[in-house]
Structure formats: structure tokens, C-alpha cells
Amino acid sequence: MIERGKFRSLTLINWNGFFARTFDLDELVTTLSGGNGAGKSTTMAAFVTALIPDLTLLHFRNTTEAGATSGSRDKGLHGKLKAGVCYSMLDVLNSRHQRVVVGVRLQQVAGRDRKVDIKPFAIQGLPMSVQPTQLVTETLNERQARVLTLAELKEKLDAMEGVQFKQFNSITDYHSLMFDLGIIARRLRSASDRSKFYRLIEASLYGGISSAITRSLRDYLLPENSGVRKAFQDMEAALRENRMTLEAIRVTQSDRDLFKHLISEATNYVAADYMRHANERRVHLDKALEFRRELYTSRKQLAAEQYKHVDMARELGEHNGAEGDLEADYQAASDHLNLVQTALRQQEKIERYEADLDELQIRLEEQNEVVAEAADMQEENEARAEAAELEVDELKSQLADYQQALDVQQTRAIQYNQAIQALDRAKALCHLPDLTADSAAEWLETFQAKEQEATEKLLSLEQKMSVAQTAHSQFEQAYQLVAAINGPLARNEAWSVARDLLREGVEQRHLAEQVQPLRMRLSELEQRLREQQEAERLLAEFCKRQGKHFDIDELEALHQELEARIAALSDSVSNAHEQRMTLRQEQEQLQSRIQHLMQRAPIWLAAQNSLNQLCEQSGEEFTSSQDVTEYLQQLLEREREAIVERDEVGARKNAVDEEIERLSQPGGSEDSRLNALAERFGGVLLSEIYDDVSFEDAPYFSALYGPSRHAIVVPDLSLIAEQLEGLTDCPEDLYFIEGDPQSFDDSVFSVDELENAVVVKTAERQWRYSRFPTVPIFGRAARENRIESLHAEREGLSERFATLSFDVQKTQRLHQAFSRFIGSHLAVAFEADPEAEIRQLNGRRVELERALATHENDNQQQRIQFEQAKEGVSALNRLLPRLNLLADDTLADRVDEIQERLDDAQEAARFIQQHGNQLAKLEPIVSVLQNDPEQFEQLKEDYAYSQQTQRDARQQAFALTEVVQRRAHFSYSDSAEMLSGNSDLNEKLRQRLEQAEAERTRAREALRGHAAQLSQYNQVLASLKSSYDTKKELLGDLQRELQDIGVRADSGSEERARIRRDELHTQLSNNRSRRNQLEKALTFCEAEMDNLTRRLRKLERDYHEMREQVVTAKAGWCAVMRMVKDNGVERRLHRRELAYLSADELRSMSDKALGALRLAVADNEHLRDVLRMSEDPKRPERKIQFFVAVYQHLRERIRQDIIRTDDPVEAIEQMEIELSRLTEELTSREQKLAISSRSVANIIRKTIQREQNRIRMLNQGLQNVSFGQVNSVRLNVNVRETHATLLDVLSEQHEQHQDLFNSNRLTFSEALAKLYQRLNPQIDMGQRTPQTIGEELLDYRNYLEMEVEVNRGSDGWLRAESGALSTGEAIGTGMSILVMVVQSWEDEGRRLRGKDISPCRLLFLDEAARLDARSIATLFELCERLQMQLIIAAPENISPEKGTTYKLVRKVFHNTEHVHVVGLRGFAPQLSETLPGTGTEDASSQAAG
């Protein structure tokens, strides 16, 4: 007999009035007695709080608040506590004699909401000697103690050996421990379970009939038929899973590429990146090596460029220095040429001016003669005009006088006067005072003779004058010529100087004639000298370029040597070209072959992958195509054998399934028709009656009843006789046994038990011998055992069938794979490895590249040598023709000598050019210099005197002529004579006047004309003199300028200066061109050096970066490789055919796969997050993690009972193999799993019958319970009418509603709900789904209606309601119902908990004074009979005779409240005994904490 667990004590720490109080609880009834406010309700509240520490439920209201849904804000708990740490602990001893202390730590939370903080805990393994108050308090002195905090309590308990302390964060865990240890009767899994438990405690505490409990008695009293419900749920779950699997298979069949897509895209995504990183790593290594090679090459190039830069800079410096000298020389040559040209122009001007001066001098001399002649003529014309004028005047005067005399009779007197005047003038002119008119004629002849003499003398002097003047002009001309040539000199030195000048002129003219030959000779020599200098320069440059000094004699030999070297290098270059062509051709052939192999490699690799897969799948090694075809024939034979074995295993599995189905019939009937027949005849199957027989007794009873073990037990056989008529739907043998199904026994037979057999005497003359069956199936235990063994066999058969089916499918797919391989890859699979040949060819290609590089280097060096040799030969070709010049050492001296001679000749030429004309003029007149014509001036004076004398004589003769002509006038004596004589004279005078006037007019015109001509001649002469003087002055200036220029100007000097300037210009241009070339080359070299420096820095940076990248990538790659190898995915990721794709192609492939994967994993949060993380290009290992996550995800989705592999790829392949087989198998399984509606109705009916029987048993326990007028209490259980109709339809008329139960779209629960709605259309189902309604209809509790009835006085059985009962009757009735609930919970919990634990039973009752003594005695009797503990609270007038009573008195001591407690155990027949732990708490008011 298992002892029931008991609550030993209740401990309150720091509650209002209780500092540290422990209440020992009685095994039956503990009574708390005391007045109002003594602390009874506080004590019970502490107990309830320790049992249910749920603040959402706890509500300690006063009795006056009964029925209220909301009381004070703190719900009564805050005010029952003191400040600080508080405890409520229960000390329990369970059925296993384990001491457990459970409780809660409470603490008020500051604030207006008056909240309380609760922490549940449990203590196990506590020694019996340790009191609860000792655990949570610490004694400070004799009158003071302190409450420990929960942490201090834990530390204290941890120090105690064997004591376990547990603190709970959830109430569920707390109640789970209490249920497992037998402290509470029911497992409180949820808040609703805790609510039910609290409502039970609350109903017990406050007494009466709780409407909350009576309205839901089914939930409290009727246990959940978890087995049946679980069976239905498992069946539906299996069906649902089956249908979901079928749907998944259909989805998989319709979207067969789902997994393939995910794994293929994941493989493409990761493998492409994996291979790209592998390729990049190889490329980076190659780049690093290439960078290093380029770095070394660039360093060499930079050093070579630096050497080249130094040479060119040195050469440029030389050219810059030479350019300055050449520029100076060129500028000097240009200036010299300009000076020569200027001198030539000056010389031309001088010559032109000299010619002009000579011409002007001639013209001047001629003009002087013309002017002199014109002057003489002018003088004559003037004298003639003057004479004519005088004659005209005289004639006019005479004529006037004659006219006047004629006019006034005085003409004779006038003429006489005029004659006298003429005589007087003649006397004056002739100095003849004695002159008379008569002697005038004589004197006229004298004076005419004198005039003739003067004229002749004048002519003689004029001739002499002309001769003297000519001699004087020649002397002056010669003297001026000598002075112009020699400079100022004395006149007496002119003759000797002129002779010297003429001799020197002859010499100078001889020298001047040699200028042109000397100039030509000098030009030739200078050209040779320049060629010699050019040759020396070329030789110096040649030696400089050759880096060695060569003598002139060595140049011809060197030329031959260089010619031979050029020929050899030319042959070498041509041979090198052919060799290079051969190497390049071989390289191109290798490259073409490598390209071809690289194109063929992916095909070969695909064939190898397919071949490797075939080898892995078949476990064979194939070395030729013949092996493949032979193995394909073996596969066909193996497939036929596997199909035969699979069909045999399938037949046996079907037989086992049929047997399992037969044994799984409700009630143990092997024929489903027996259940319907049993219901029809109102009986019970014998197998159902013996359903509880043990497995050990099953063989006996199976043998006992033999064939009748499937009989139907009916109360009366006579009642079924009529029903047997026309019975066709039944087994061949149908047995009936008469008996009471409730009290059936096996006494209907006479039986003798033998060893493993029985002899049944069915009649006096009929015995039956039955051996115990080897595999009994009579009774639920035997059937379950047999079903279990059949299930085990079925599992084996199913596994074998699945294995064989998988093998068949695998063989078929392997056959298909071989067929595909033969069709696609057989032609190339067994060819040589192209990658090995590629590696070999790459090695050869590297050798060729190295040979080409070496060859190019050698060829470059040969080309340089060839170019150097060509340059040397070219320089020698220019040098060799000038070897004689190089050997001529006297050339410069000869040039100097000729230059001196040329200078002398040019000086002479300049002298002749300057004075040649003067010497030529001087030579014919040089003799006039012997005598100096000094008398020329005296002659000029004589000539002037003679001229004046001749003029005076002419005037005197003219005056005498006039006197002679007027001699007649002296004889006028009278006027007649005068008139007659004057008339002729007048006529003559008039005639002479006309003649004289005509002569005067001619003389005047001649004079004017001659005067104008003389003026013109004088103007011409003045102009000629002015021009002569100007040109002479300009000539002097030009000669001075020519002397100032200091350049000898001749016909060849300009050409030589120009040639020299052009040569220097050519040299300067060549120098500048070379300098520009050098500058450009230097700039290019510097740029190349800068480029090389930058490139070198870039290469160094790139090399270091690439090296760091390689090192970093190596670490990352090692991590990736480690992860790949650890997860075994290298075979999937290292796809060698991807190595032949470019990085862009691989990146594109990865990006495309990434886009597809984003869509594929959009609904999977984990894979989506991992995929998002894997997109980081700097973390390639995350892509491996994603691939592993995909594999893991697919592995988790692989059903190991279907597909036996961890590899998702193989799983996908196996999945395709299993799809068709699973579809067929699951379809048949669904048909087997589907339970019939009749079976459901039978199960629900049997469950209802069983629970009705159990309620009847509970009612028997309450028959003797009475409270006041209530004599008995019972529970009435009835089936609802609507649900009874549903059961009838399910049993009898289910064929009419097969459209619901045969629908694949509806679960059984939904079909059941649809049927219920179809049968009861008037019922409103609300918002509930058919699935929810169907699940409720599968719960038998929803078919029942329960109500509490009491047998009260004369009213008989009435429905128990608070309004119809008194307070005491209601309390007693309610307590009875609660006892039934607790007992029902224990029965339910017994199936969930160990059977060796009997839980504690405890109820409360507050304000028990409302019960009378008989009712209280009934409670005590009920507690004793049911082994239940009861805590009641009553005023002091309640004094029960049994149990333990605590009297509580609240006192005030020093302004502090405390409760004085005295405990008594019994008191009527026994002596009073003070319980331990009671007495006044003297120190409670002074306690700290």
C-alpha cells in the first residue's frame, strides 16, 4: 500500500503579525481558531500563495467581496506583508518519504500600485532536524533575528552537503516539480490549468457551490481521453503528414527541379567563386612572379638608361659647348659676310662715284669752255647792243633835233648843237681838246687804226691766254691727281712723287692681276683645310664612338674588319630571324594545341566526372569502353533479380498489414462485422470482456474459448433468436454466449488444464482439446504484443521492400546513367588526359618563351653590334677618301702663305681700284708737272688791260665817227638850206634810224638769247660744280667708310665669306640638330627613366601588394580549404572544368546564381541571412558556409526513413528514385490509416460508457455524505441529443455521407464537423473553423452533460444550486464536489506520473462556523476515508474533537502587532498537549528585517 504524501508544516516569515511562525499541519484536519483579525485568513493566504504563486490569479478578498471580479488594487496580498523580505514555505513529505520544502520569497514593491514581487523556490535533501525557520533567519542575539535574502539563503544551502536549492523563473517549472514530487495532484501545464486549480482552492476556501466549477464540471471531473484523442490526432497527423508528403511529392514531381535548382545554383554560386578564387590565386601567383621578373628587368633597364643618360648628357654638354663656339664663329662669319657685302657695295658706290666724278669733270671742263665762249659772246653782244643802242639814241636824237628844227625852224641849230655835243664827247673820250670837225676825220683814221691795233693785240693775248690756261689746268689737274693719290705735298715735289706713283702703280697693277688666281688657290686650300678639319672631327668622333684611339694607318684595316663583321652579323641576324620564326611557329603551334586541348578539356572533364560518378555508383573501375558495355549487361540481369525479390517482399508486407489491420479492430474482433452485430444484438464481444486479460493468461483463455473467443455475450439468448433469421452479413461461424457482461466469468465451461493445453468439455459427449497458441491474440495485451511483433516484422519488411525498391530504382537509374554516358561521353572518356598534356605543353611553352627571350636579347645585342658596325663603316667611308688630307701637315702653312700673298694682292687691287683712274689720268699729263705755270696771272692781267684798251679805242673811234658824221651840221647857216638840206638828212636819218633800230632789236634779241643761254650755261656749270663737289665729298666719305670697314672687297671675298658662313651654318645646324636629337633623346631618356622609375615604384608597390595579397589570400585560402575539407564539399566545389572559364564568366555565373538563389531562399530566413552574409567579396569562406548551410538545410529536409544518405546531391538523385514508389506506398498507407466513421462512433460510445461507469463509482462514494437536509449527493451524466444523433448517423447511416469522409481535401475532423453542421443546421457555429469543431467532436466530453444533484428532504433529487440550499448545505455539497474533482485529478495524473507516488490531498475551508457539528463530523469522516488533509478556520466557539487546533490571538506590544499562537492536538478524550513550535513570540516584535 502506497502511503499518501502529507503537508508537514506551513512557515510564515515576516508576514503581518508573523515574524517567524511555523504551523505543524495535522494529517487530517488543522483548525485555525481565533477572533476577527486574529490572522486565520492571512495564514491560509500564505499557504495558497506558496501553492500558486501567480499574481494574475491571487485575490484574497473578504467574504463581503464574494462574487466580485475586482477588489482592492493589491488583491489582498500587499497588506498582509511587512516591509522587507518575506517567505511562505511548505514542508512536505511525499509518498517516497522525501522531504521537500517549497515556497516563495515575497517582497513589497515601492509604488502606488502596491505590487508584490514573488520568487518561487524549492529545497530538496534537507535533514529532518532542520526547521524551516532556521533556514531563512539569522539570530543576532537573544531577542533579535534577521531575515535572509534569497541569495543568502542559496549560499547557506550550498554550504550544506546533500541539500539542493532550486530557484524557478517560471511558475510552470515550479508546478512541474511539485507534480513530479507528488505535492499537487494535477500537472499544471498552462495558465488555464493554474486557473482551474486556483478556482478549486478558492471554491474550497470560501465554501459553497462554485458556479465556475459546476459550469465546467466536465473539464474538472472527466479526464481528457488523451489516448483516444492522441490516437485520433496521430491518425489525423499521420494522414495529414501522409497527404502533405503526397502533396510534397506531387509538388516535387511537378517542380522536380526545386532541390536541383537550389543545389545546382548554390553549387554554381559557390563553385564559380571558389574556382575564381583558385584561378585568381594562381593568377596572382603568376602576376607576383611576373611583377618580380618585370621588377628585375625594369631595374636593369633603368640602370642601362641611366648609363645612356650619362653618355648623352656628356655628349650634349660637349655639343652645347661646341654650339657656343659655332654660334660665335657663325655670327662672325655672318658679320664678315655682311661686312664684305657692305664693302662690296661701298666699292661699287666708290667706283660708280669715281666714274660719275670723271664724267662730271669732263663735262665741267667742257661747260667751262662753253661758259667762257658764251661770256665772250655775251660781252660782244653787250658791246654791239650798246653801240646799237647808242646809235639809235643818237639817230633818234638827231632825228628829233632835225624834226624839231624842222618843226620850230631850229632843226639846224639842234643839229648844230648835237654836232657840237658830239664833238665835245669826242674831245673828252679821245683826249683831244683841239679836235675840230674838220680834223675829226683825220683823228678818226688814227683812232680806227689804234682800235685795230688794240683788237689784234687782244686777240694775241687771248690766244696766249688760252694756251696758258690749258697748261695751267693740266698742271693743276696733274697736281690734284698726285695730291689725291699721295696726299698733300709741295708743288715742286709733284714731279718726283708722280713718277714714283706711276712706277708703284705698275707694280700694284701687276699684283692686283694676281688676286683672282691667289683667291682661287686660297679657296681651294681653305676647302681642303676644312675637309681636313672635318676629317679630324669625324676621326675624333669615330674614335670616341669606338671607344678606342685609331691611327690613320689602321683605318683601312679596321674598315675591312668592320665589313667582315657586318657580313657575319648580317648572316647571324638573318639566321636569327629564321630561328625566331621557327621558335614562334613552334610557339604558335603549341598555343593552338593548348587552345584545342583547353576547349576539349571541359568535355573530357565532364566525361570523367560522369565516369567517376558511374564508378562511385557501381563500385567498379572501368578502363575501356568494353568494360562499360559489359557492366551494362550485368545491370540488366541484376535489375530483373531485384524486381522479383521486391515483389515477394511486397506480398509478404501486404499480408502483415492485413493481419495488423485485423488485430487492430476495436474490441479485439478480427472481423469488423462483429462489432456491428454486437451492437445490433445488444451484447458485448467476448474479446472485449477479456480485453484486460494479462499477456500471461492470454494463451490460457485463448485455448479455453477456442473458436468461440470471438463470441458475442448477450444477457438473454432467447431475445436474439428472432434476429438471427435472415442474417447474412456475418462470419461463417457466429457464437453467442448468455451472461452478464458486467459480471461475466469463465464458469460456463468444464475445463481441465494440462501442460500448455486445456481440455474443454463442451458437452457430455463432446470434448475439445486446445493447445496454448504460440502467438496468442486473445486480449488487448496479447494483441498489442502480436501487433508489436508484426509491426517490427512489417518495419523489417518495409525497410527491405524500400531497400529493394530503391535498389531497383537505383539500378534502373544507373542503367539510364550508363546509357546516357555511352551516348554522350563514351567517345572521349577513355582518351588521354588533356590537362596532363596541357601541363607538358605549358612547360614546353615556358621553355620556348625563355628561349625566345634569350634569343631576342642576343638578337638585340647583335643588332646593336650590327648598327655600331654600320655606323663605323659609314664613318670610315667618309674618312678613307680624306686620309691624304689627314696626312698633309703643311696644308695650314700653305693656307697662311697664300693668305698673306692674297692680302698683299688685295691691298694692291684696292690701291689700283682706288687710284687706278687717277694714275691713268696722271700718266699722259705727268710731264706738265716739270714746269709750274706761275706767269699765267700776269698774262691774265695783260689780257684784261688789252681788252679795256680795245674797248676804249672802240668808244673813241665811235665818238670820232659820230663827229665825222655830224661834220656837216657845223656848216648850217640858214634855215632854207637847213630845211632843204635837212630833208635829205632827215630821210637818211630815218633810214639809218630804222636800220639802227633793227640792228638794236637784233642786238637786244641776240643779247637776251645769249644772256639766257649764258645763264643756262652758268646754271649747268653751277649744277655740275655742285654735283661734282657733292659726289667728291660723298666719294671721300665712302672711301673713309671703306677704310673704316677694314675689309678687302674683291670679287671672290663675298663667295668665300658666304661659303664659310654656309659651312659654319651647316656645322651649327648639324650641331643643333644633333643637340636637339640629344635633347630629345635625353628628354625621352629622362621620360623613359621617369617612366621606368614610376613603373619601378608601381611594380614594387604592385609586387608588394600582390605578395601581401598572395600571403593574405593564402591564409584565407587555407581557411577556405580547411573548411571545404572539414565539411567534405571539395568534390562538389572543385569543378575542374570551371578552371577554363575567365574571371568575368565565373563572376557572371556566380552573379546569375546569386540572383536565382535570392529568389530560391526568399522564404528561408536562415539561408537568406547566410546568403546575404556570403555576398561579402572579402570573406570567401562565408560562401563555403552558405554552401554548407544549404547542404545542412537539405540534409535536414531529407527523410532518413525514405532516403538513406547525408549527401543532398545523392539525396536528390535518390529522391527521384523514390518519388514514384513513395507515391504508391503513401496512397495505400492513406487508405489504411483512414479510420471508418463507425469505428469512431464505437470508440466514442465505449469511452462514454466507461466514464459513465466511473462517475457511477464516484457517486457510490458520495451516497453516505449528508449535510443538514441533504441526504446524498450525486453526479448525473447524460448524452446530448444532437451528439447522440451524430453517433447514430456515424454508426448506421455513414454510407449516406461518404462524400465527406472520402474527400482528400478534408481531414476526418473537418468531415465530422461538416456532418455535424449538416445534421444540425439550426446551431450557430460562430467563427470557429471546421477543424476546431471537428476536434471538439472527437472529444467525448463534449457529448456529455453533467450536473450535480442532491437528495434533500422531501424534495427528492434536485439540481444542486446555492439558492435552493442553506449555507452549510451548500458548503458541504461544494466540498463533496471538490473531493470528487481531486480524486478525478489523481486518477488522471496517475497515468502521467509514476505509480509509486500518491499525491497530497488538501483542501481549505474558511469561516467553518457556518457548519453544524454533524456537518463538521461528516467532513472529518470524509477526510479520514479519503486520506485528505483539511485546513479550516473558525471562530473560537468551534472546537473540533479531532485533528490539531491552533488558537490565534493578535496582540499589540510596544506599538507592534504580533499574533500569539497556541496549538492543541485533540482535547476530548486525550490530555492537552502543546505542540512544538507554539507559544508566544517574545522576540518577534524586536526582530530586524
Swiss-Prot record:
Single GO term (MF): ATP binding
Region (Flexible hinge): 666-783
Pfam families to which the protein is assigned, alphabetical: MukB, MukB_hinge, SbcC_Walker_B
Biological process annotations from GO: cell division; chromosome condensation; chromosome segregation; DNA replication
Keywords: ATP-binding, Cell cycle, Cell division, Chromosome partition, Coiled coil, Cytoplasm, DNA condensation, DNA-binding, Nucleotide-binding
Residues annotated as transmembrane: none
List of residues binding ATP: G34, G35, N36, G37, A38, G39, K40, S41
Domain of life: Bacteria
Cellular component terms (Gene Ontology): cytoplasm; nucleoid
Residue ranges the record marks as coiled coil: 326-418, 444-472, 509-602, 780-805, 835-919, 977-1116, 1209-1266
InterPro entries reported in the protein's UniProt record: MukB, MukB/SMC, MukB_hinge, MukB_hinge_sf, MukB_N_dom, P-loop_NTPase
Cell location: Cytoplasm, Nucleoid
Family of this protein: Belongs to the SMC family. MukB subfamily.
UniProt domain comment: The hinge domain, which separates the large intramolecular coiled coil regions, allows the homodimerization, forming a V-shaped homodimer.
Assembly and interaction partners: Homodimerization via its hinge domain. Binds to DNA via its C-terminal region. Interacts, and probably forms a ternary complex, with MukE and MukF via its C-terminal region. The complex formation is stimulated by calcium or magnesium. Interacts with tubulin-related protein FtsZ.
Its job: Plays a central role in chromosome condensation, segregation and cell cycle progression. Functions as a homodimer, which is essential for chromosome partition. Involved in negative DNA supercoiling in vivo, and by this means organize and compact chromosomes. May achieve or facilitate chromosome segregation by condensation DNA from both sides of a centrally located replisome during cell division.
Protein's recorded name: Chromosome partition protein MukB
Organism: Citrobacter koseri (strain ATCC BAA-895 / CDC 4225-83 / SGSC4696)
Gene transcribed to yield this protein: mukB
